[in-house]
Structures are given as structure tokens and as C-alpha cells.
From Swiss-Prot:
More about this protein: Can complement a S.typhimurium mutant lacking waaF.
A single GO BP: lipopolysaccharide core region biosynthetic process
EC code(s) of this entry: 2.4.99.24
Matching InterPro entries: Glyco_trans_9, LPS_LOS_Heptosyltrfase, RfaF
UniProt entry tagged with the keyword Ribonucleoprotein: no
Name of the coding gene: waaF
Keywords on record: Glycosyltransferase, Transferase
Protein name, per record: Lipooligosaccharide heptosyltransferase 2
Length: 348
């Protein structure tokens, strides 16, 4: 069986989709799984052994461009037996429809009745995103109940020689850590500061860990450079040499390798958090949640500890009450609490 997946457009969602690919291989061992996704996803898909081929989706997130979708779909005709559409948007279902793939499966989303012929409507029965993904591996009449759904955690393959090569590219920066074990911080998050643990808490945590003999490596995209530098500059001058700001200086592939080299990770609810959770050699991970809900998109790792001080589901907010836009529930998570959780994880 040849299967086309229309993949998600976010790092964390792409990582979690690996659970679906594993389940498809369990059910159809000889299947060929191709994933259409944005080009930046290739480094992640290359680390998922179940994926046969990554197909670049040239249309940007949010763009409609119907005729281009038609041409892409037409180019894929007579190649696939099954299509699974992971995004909920109406437009994401066009390419399998135009490709005339016989079986087109996905959740109802934006009322895609005319485009998908295996439309699932009971999404609320599966509260976790990874459950919704894995449920699509099954025929409509054979989907297990949520508690019985087999969930294989995502795992991104890493190789010691590739990690060493990546470290060599950043050797000049990393030598400043004087061979101290690294703790990685992922201080960024999409959709504004309400999802971020305050930079001054990260700085205090870094001071404590540096005193304990660790070094700190800050990861993130170019958008996270300023917040990461605020953390570094928040340290005492003699401690700054042990805090390396790599935000915006790595590509996604390099970030995976360098995160894999860390002794542990502290992260906001972000794509990098899901990457840290999904390494094939799991790392101790402290995941910090505020208004977003770990009951929907938790880090899928037995080495992860979640800290969240409020109950309930998602709170739709992009800016918190504090001056910097931080959410009070994240402000209330103290560095000492994070140190306590890290100590327990590192002792295991």
C-alpha cells in the first residue's frame, strides 16, 4: 500500500505525527509512507525511519492558491492508495482530492465533506492530538477507544558521529563551557510571551546550575535571539562565559544534534520541547506550561516532567498580565521548583 500523508506545518505537530507513521507500519508492514510538508520539515522526517520520502509542500501556510494545488494533485495521480490529511483546514484536503486518491481520510475540520470520503467526526472522543493522529491509522469501524489506542512515542534518530560533526562546527563557542555537562534551555514559544517562562527566571536557574558545575546552552530561532540574550546578560559577569546563546545560529538539524548532546533540557511549551522529548535516547526534560494545556499536547517521553500551576484546558491568551506579557501562572513557577525536578530526573 502506498500512503500519502498531508503533514502539519508546526514543529511540535510534525514530531507527534511520527506516532501515526509507526502505527501505519505496524498495520501495513510493506506500506510506503510519503509525507507532504513544508521544506523545513525535511530534517525531522529524515530522522523517522518509517517515512519513505518527504515531498516539499511549496504553498505557504495560510495561502490558498487553488490552481497550484490542482497542479500538484494532478502530478500525484495514480501513485497512492490512501491519503491521510492531518491539518484541519479545508484547503489542506484539496491535493489528495485533485490527485484522485481513492481513500481520503481525515477529521471533519472545516466541514470537508466533499473532499474527504472517510471523514471522522468524533474528534472530541480523542482529547490528545497524538490520539487523533494515531486514530487515523485505523479503518473507521476498527478505531480503538482512546484508552485502548496504541501510542508509540515519537523518536528522532540521532547518530553519535553526526552529533560530533555538529559540535565541531560550534567548537569555538562550546569550548567556553570548559567541558562542563550542558543543560539546554528552550526559552522561546510561538504566539507571544504568555507561553514563556520569564527570562529572569531562566537567568536565575542558569546561575544555580552554573554554580553546580553545569554549562547552559540556549536554543531557539532568530525570533528568540533577543529573549535568549536577555537571559545570558541577566547572569553575573563571571557566569556569562558558561552560558552559550545559540538561538538563531543553528538550523533545525543542528539543533536536534546539539539538544541530543545535552544532559537535560528545560523548555517552554514549544516545538523544541517536542524535539527534546522525542530523541531516540531520551533526555531528562522539564516542560513548563502556563495557559496552554499539557492534556492536549504533552511531551511524549517517560523522561519528562510537566510543571503547570493551573487546572483546566487551553486558555486562549497571547499576552499575560505582567508588564513583559508573561502569564502569572508561569511567573509563579520558581527556579527552585525547576531545580528540584531537574535534580530528581538527573538522579535517576
Amino acid at each position: 500500500m502506498k500512503i500519502l500523508i498531508i503533514g502539519p506545518s508546526w514543529v511540535g505537530d510534525m514530531v507527534m505525527s511520527h506516532s501515526l507513521y509507526q502505527q501505519l507500519k505496524q498495520q501495513y508492514p510493506k506500506s510506503q509512507i510519503d509525507v507532504m510538508a513544508p521544506d523545513w520539515c525535511r530534517p525531522l522526517l529524515a530522522r523517522m525511519p518509517e517515512v519513505h520520502k518527504a515531498i516539499t509542500m511549496p504553498i505557504g501556510h495560510g495561502a490558498f492558491r487553488l490552481m497550484e494545488r490542482y497542479q500538484i494533485g494532478k502530478s500525484l495521480r495514480n501513485q497512492y492508495d490512501l491519503a491521510i490529511v492531518l491539518p484541519n483546514s479545508f484547503k489542506s484536503a484539496f491535493i489528495p482530492f485533485f490527485a484522485r486518491i481513492a481513500h481520503r481520510r481525515g477529521w471533519k475540520g472545516e466541514s470537508r465533506y466533499c473532499l474527504l470520503n472517510d471523514l471522522r467526526t468524533n474528534k472530541n472522543d480523542y482529547p490528545m492530538m497524538v490520539q487523533r493522529y494515531v486514530a487515523l491509522a485505523f479503518e473507521a469501524t476498527q478505531v480503538p477507544k482512546p484508552d485502548d489506542l496504541p501510542i508509540a512515542f515519537p523518536y528522532l534518530q540521532t547518530q553519535a558521529d553526526e552529533i560530533a560533526q555538529t559540535k565541531a562546527k560550534f567548537a569555538q563557542k562550546l569550548t567556553a563551557t570548559e567541558n562542563r555537562p550542558l543543560i539546554g534551555f528552550c526559552p522561546g514559544a510561538e504566539f507571544g510571551p504568555a507561553k514563556r517562562w520569564p527570562h529572569y527566571h531562566y537567568a536565575k536557574l542558569a546561575e544555580i546550575l552554573i554554580e553546580k558545575g553545569f554549562a547552559i546552552c540556549l536554543f531557539g530561532s532568530k525570533k528568540d535571539q533577543i529573549i535568549a540574550e536577555q537571559i545570558r546578560l541577566g547572569l553575573a559577569e563571571h557566569s556569562q562565559r558558561y552560558c552559550i546563546n545559540l538561538a538563531g545560529q543553528t538550523d533545525l538539524n543542528q539543533a536536534v544534534d546539539l539538544i541530543a548532546d545535552c544532559r537535560a533540557i528545560v523548555s517552554n511549551d514549544s516545538g523544541l520541547m517536542h524535539i527534546a522529548a522525542a530523541l531516540n535516547k531520551p533526555k531528562p526534560l522539564v516542560a513548563l506550561y502556563g495557559p496552554t494545556s499539557p492534556s492536549y499536547t504533552p511531551p511524549l517521553s517517560k523522561q519528562a516532567v510537566i510543571i503547570r500551576l493551573i487546572d483546566g484546558g487551553l486558555i486562549k491568551i497571547r499576552k499575560g498580565e505582567a508588564k513583559e506579557g508573561y502569564h502569572q501562572s508561569l511567573i509563579d513557577i520558581t527556579p527552585d521548583r525547576v531545580v528540584q525536578e531537574l535534580n530528581q530526573l538527573l538522579a535517576c
